[in-house]
């Protein structure tokens, strides 16, 4: 069996490019495979294929990532995103599939706090429907690998500055909470680009 190695991916937890493709099952050992194992371009996942099975391994921090995260397809039920600080414009994004439908609610404001989740929010909320792109939106969101991010990214050398928060609940009950202060995870720009792809302004 010929071993195909994809370009090395960035670890979504530590940002290292020293990653390897996970090869599951019982491949025939060849000199080509042994060379890739020695170079840590490939790691063996084991003869029993895990479900769900990650596709990549980080040689730096040991994190396995990629592939399907759930045994059955799961879609976003609720999403809350915030980025901002005491100075400049803050941004809020909210989605609640059961309460508001497949619609992204978005606010940009100089205010320090806006309850974007409330129907009575006293602000100008932009509504961006994504009902016809729902499956694609969920797929693109997962490709930001936020499930693999650390729970907190903190730069202790900056007191004020910019804070951000991402909370996502899936329809299978899984909830992911991520937070940062003046520090950002790998694939952060990819997340911002994903929101822009579905009709939101570019968040800087």
Task: Kindly give the residue locations of the regions a language model identified.
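Cys/His-rich microdomains that often coordinate metals
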Residues: 18, 64-65
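Charged, amphipathic alpha-helical segments
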Residues: 130-155, 199-202
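Short recognition patches in nucleic-acid-associated and regulatory proteins
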Residues: 9, 13-51
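Short Cys/His-rich metal-coordination motifs, predominantly Zn2+-binding knuckles/fingers
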Residues: 14, 59-62
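A composition-biased, non-transmembrane "mature-region" signal
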Residues: 2-7, 24, 28, 53-56, ...
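Short, surface-exposed linear segments at secondary-structure transitions and domain or protein termini
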Residues: 182-197
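N-terminal domain-start interaction segment
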Residues: 4, 9, 69-128, 152-179, ...
